[in-house]
């Protein structure tokens, strides 16, 4: 970890465009603030996530982390308009090894952001309200504990935009909600409400509103922070030991798969439909 990440300077929110950070009483709180609509995950999100969570991991004053979204929604997921430039070269008809290798590097870089959350030795509690779509689900599956407000809605939406989810949902969800529920959500791209999310174990508890969900997340983080920090880290390490290799293998596989097979006419159609605000017409090409 680089020196500038391990110093308290990482806490200065003025250097970030996608996050706001506070630390008090051994609990860090990180809030998604955009700049895309609905806290969509654009270039700033992906470049800032790693140093922030490496900072939490290395900061002895931080014992637990709360993550939440600003405004009404947790996150709309990947900011396709903002990221479209990264997809362009690999979608070109003559795209060969060069653009595909660059695309593979981009996937690995984005995976590293979500992994920084999952690998943080300080337990992460996610408070979800409103929409949590695509990359938002990737992010909350990397958290250790999830709570939601009654208005929360979840969707593994990638299949509906011709993308195989590659940031961690397919690797982590089966251990959280089971294989059957994971397949249903990932293959249909359907939306589920907070009540079902609680029934299948995606969230631990559902609270009346956003304020109550955030208060519950803060209370849980405070309970964790009151325990011996090295023992908490030991519990985390033991719990994570068995899942690490399986998740890592899955992430490597999907990064390679998407680099080889994701570019398609259907993906181009999905991107065009997003910009033109219409329903895509997929042809399996």
Report the location of each language-model feature:
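Acidic, divalent-metal-coordinating active-site segment for phosphoryl/phosphodiester hydrolysis
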Residues: 189-196
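Glycine- (often His-adjacent) and acidic-residue-rich active-site loop
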Residues: 37, 69-113, 246
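CoA-thioester-processing core
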Residues: 113-119, 127, 133-187, 200, ...
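Conserved CoA-thioester-binding segment of acyl-CoA-metabolizing enzymes
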Residues: 1-70
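C-terminal long alpha-helix characteristic of the crotonase
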Residues: 147-152, 203-252, 281-285
């Amino acid at each position: 970890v680089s020196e500038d990440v391990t110093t308290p300077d990482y806490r200065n929110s003025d250097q970030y465009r996608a996050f706001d950070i506070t630390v008090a009483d051994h609990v860090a709180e990180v809030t998604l603030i955009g700049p895309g609509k609905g806290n969509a995950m654009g270039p700033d999100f992906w470049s800032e996530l790693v140093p922030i969570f490496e900072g939490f991991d290395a900061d002895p004053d931080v014992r637990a982390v709360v993550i939440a979204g600003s405004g009404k929604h947790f996150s709309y997921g990947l900011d396709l308009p903002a990221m479209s430039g990264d997809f362009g070269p690999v979608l070109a008809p003559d795209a060969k090894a060069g653009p595909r290798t660059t695309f593979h590097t981009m996937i690995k870089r984005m995976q590293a952001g979500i992994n920084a959350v999952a690998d943080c030795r300080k337990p992460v509690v996610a408070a979800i309200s409103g929409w949590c779509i695509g990359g938002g689900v990737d992010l909350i599956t990397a958290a250790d504990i999830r709570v939601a407000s009654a208005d929360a809605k979840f969707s593994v939406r990638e299949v509906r935009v011709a993308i195989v989810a590659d940031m961690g949902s397919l690797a982590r969800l089966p251990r959280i909600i089971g294989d059957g529920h994971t397949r249903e959500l990932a293959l249909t791209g359907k939306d589920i409400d907070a009540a079902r999310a609680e029934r299948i174990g995606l969230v631990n508890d559902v609270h009346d509103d956003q304020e109550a969900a955030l208060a519950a997340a803060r209370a849980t983080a405070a309970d964790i922070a009151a325990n011996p920090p090295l023992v908490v880290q030991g519990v985390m390490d033991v719990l994570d030991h068995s899942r690490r290799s399986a998740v890592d293998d899955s992430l490597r596989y999907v990064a390679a798969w998407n680099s080889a097979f994701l570019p398609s006419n259907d993906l181009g159609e999905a991107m065009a439909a997003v910009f033109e605000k219409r329903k895509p017409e997929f042809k399996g090409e």
